[in-house]
């Protein structure tokens, strides 16, 4: 549940009587969960007695229940083979490089009492960064220019490095909305809980906006127009100990000036996305940051700043937006295990703050955020 100081005035915090019921029944709320919302009161005292292990199990089960298969490639008539657990970060050349004994570290939810925090968890490279978003044929063919060839800052490569995290996030946003609808289905009383309805509205907005961006990419692909992607590329002369691929909105530029509002203030709000991929190579690291030119008004200034900044300034900025922007990040075991406890705690709490605006504000005011360096060698 998102923690905010005050709910925005332009977000509906109630479900309208003739609005489609958020439980997913496709009936009007008035004739579905509205009568049940007062009949089925949840016993929070009993819930709080549940052990954390049970809460974690229920959370993971509810999320796993939202899994679905789809091929997000643009030419569906060419689909062949089963939908597979496609890697959004390449396994052979990237994940293998930072793994030890075939494992990495990732962020996962950690249930402590009534609070959901975060912790590090070891994950197999066979499962890391995977999602059921492409058929076997398209997973191999579509991304061949970035899978089989070295990166050379070519237009088609930049398009694909942007599309891959977009596809992952489209899939995740659909699942997140389904996750919240399933909660309402199980717990009709929560349909009149303002915080839960706000999270539901946010999930609706995210699904709509990511699907809209997907359609923009689909149009460009069908027209073979790969030049609508602006890319900033930086090659480091050392290997980082993590890999990430994300699609997200950036709130502030390098000077701290606001670009976007990342908290939903209105249901007609637009989400302006950037695409970030960072991965190590032999004695080097590729950093690829892109946006679609339809969002040039939002990101032109930021990219001009990046193009004129020193490497130190760029890495300091990326150190923040990587953790703020995406959960799709995987660390080498050596990196996590060699962090000082204060650095490890800061990394975890900074990731948690990306999901909780009140916590982010508190850490910023205390100058206690981002006390780690992702780009240390």
Model-identified regions with their sequence ranges:
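Cysteine-centered loop/knuckle micro-motif
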Residues: 30-34
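Charge-dense, low-complexity intrinsically disordered regions
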Residues: 45-48, 207-377
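Short, intrinsically disordered linker segments that flank or connect zinc-binding domains
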Residues: 4-12
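Internal, well-ordered alpha/beta segment that forms a basic, Gly-enriched binding/recognition surface
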Residues: 102-201
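Metal-centered catalytic cores of metalloenzymes
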Residues: 51-60, 66-69, 123, 177-183, ...
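Extracellular cysteine-rich, disulfide-stabilized repeat modules
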Residues: 19-22
